[in-house]
């Protein structure tokens, strides 16, 4: 079903591009900013910060967006990632390190500017702007802006760039119906920014879902045009949609239509704001359920969160570059940093930059020594010797008579369990490197 829908969307997109070609590129197909979740950096010491900053600079990163530095759980408890004296945070769980201070101090003088994410509440996902909780959050965010500006930004003014409004809007029905309340809350936050450093931009990063109750792109354009017109945006503010490919809410084939929609919405809103792109460099796992393809994404081959190989990531950035002024990503630190993950992804990206946005094309060698065995539970196991590559192998893809069976990531064993193996079945294994180059297939018959 997913492949059929992809094909239909691809045909529609091709026709649309013939009628209305993509505009000329507005930026290079590369990212210069990244999101970093506060929980991840909460235990970084200065040495780790400097390691991350060094590799971010190698990758050309200029903007570091710290995600929510205060988060409210469904039971009302707060987790706060900076030293705050706000009454609302009394009794909160404070992180081991002050993320705001650490980010600003370590980035000071590095050439990387920090955007600070404000508050978030877990009930956003099932309430959106309805009820008192959202309005109260915006009040808290306004107080956070004043406090953080006074205690941190004034000390590190050259490292600070702006603010990130963390609740993630979408084209879902709850967001649409409560959008007047959401806009009112954002206006409150902008007022707070104006009272501190009026030149500081506010960044929003919503997403589009082609699943659920309102999957039509034209409907989304009407919504975003109306919503953007309601917010008191200033010329420095940034509308930076997630492309939602990594999370599975969008097919890659649909990206030209979606970015055209966002571009049109900004133009038709009458707001003089910046359109950036948040291109996702990961793939979320999604499992088969009764809602797959209806309200939730289709199942994925990967069963864990994985780094997207650079071929897909580059295609995302190339499309976005025709509509967006600038590209950032979620998340270099989580999925591409050699300090946190395998260096092959960082090295492949650097090679891409150094070679003028051309992907390296050397394929891995084919897996060898394929063999079947039986584990202690009596399951059939297919194992193999690892492939080699000039930079690194990201994963292996296993098929049975041409149909997908399993995927093995670079950190996993070179073996997969075969359910209900049948005599005469031909199993094939293909290795993929960090650029997405496939090896020749290695085969074995059961």
Provide a role label for each language-model segment.
Residues 119-121, 145-178:
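Active-site groove signature of glycoside hydrolases
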Residues 95-110, 131-162, 220-232, 320:
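An active-site-proximal structural segment forming one wall of the substrate-binding cleft
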Residues 418-437:
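Beta-strand-rich modules
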Residues 387-401:
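Solvent-exposed loop/turn segments flanking beta-strands in beta-repeat/beta-sandwich domains
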């Amino acid at each position: 079903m997913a492949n059929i829908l992809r094909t239909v969307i691809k045909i529609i997109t091709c026709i649309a591009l013939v009628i209305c070609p993509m505009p000329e590129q507005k930026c290079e197909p590369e990212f210069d900013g990244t999101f970093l979740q506060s929980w991840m950096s909460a235990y970084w010491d200065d040495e780790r910060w400097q390691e991350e900053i060094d590799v971010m600079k190698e990758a050309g990163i200029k903007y570091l967006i710290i995600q929510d530095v205060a988060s409210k759980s469904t039971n009302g408890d707060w987790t706060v990632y900076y030293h705050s004296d706000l009454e609302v945070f009394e009794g909160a769980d404070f992180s081991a390190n002050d993320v705001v201070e650490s980010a600003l101090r370590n980035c000071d003088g590095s050439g990387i500017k920090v955007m600070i994410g404000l508050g978030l509440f877990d009930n956003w996902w099932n309430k959106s702007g309805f009820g008192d909780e959202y309005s109260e959050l915006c009040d808290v965010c306004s107080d956070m802006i004043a406090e953080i500006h006074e205690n941190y930004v004034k000390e590190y003014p050259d490292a600070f760039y702006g603010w990130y409004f963390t609740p993630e809007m979408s084209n879902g029905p709850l967001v649409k119906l409560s959008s007047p309340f959401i806009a009112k809350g954002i206006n409150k936050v902008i007022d707070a920014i104006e009272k501190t450093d009026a030149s500081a931009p506010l960044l929003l990063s919503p997403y589009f879902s082609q699943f659920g109750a309102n999957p039509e792109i034209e409907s989304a354009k009407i919504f975003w045009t109306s919503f953007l017109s309601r917010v008191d945006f200033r010329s420095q503010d940034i509308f930076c949609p997630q492309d939602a490919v990594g999370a599975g809410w969008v097919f890659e084939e649909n990206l030209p239509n979606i970015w055209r929609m966002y571009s049109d919405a900004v133009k038709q809103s009458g707001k003089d704001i910046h359109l950036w792109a948040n291109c996702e460099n990961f793939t979320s796992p999604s499992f088969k359920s009764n809602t797959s393809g209806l309200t939730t994404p289709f199942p994925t081959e990967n069963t864990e969160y994985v780094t997207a190989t650079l071929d897909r990531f580059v295609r995302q950035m190339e499309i976005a570059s025709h509509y967006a002024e600038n590209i950032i990503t979620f998340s270099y630190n989580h999925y591409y940093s050699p300090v946190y993950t395998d260096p092959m992804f960082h090295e492949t990206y650097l090679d891409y930059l150094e070679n003028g946005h051309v992907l390296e094309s050397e394929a891995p060698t084919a897996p060898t020594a394929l063999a079947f065995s039986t584990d202690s539970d009596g399951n059939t196991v297919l194992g193999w010797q690892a492939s080699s590559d000039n930079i690194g192998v990201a994963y292996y893809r296993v098929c049975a008579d041409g149909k997908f069976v399993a995927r093995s990531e670079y950190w996993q064993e070179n073996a997969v369990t075969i359910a209900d193996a049948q005599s005469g079945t031909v199993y094939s294994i293909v290795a993929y490197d960090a650029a997405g180059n496939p090896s020749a297939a290695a085969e074995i018959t059961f």
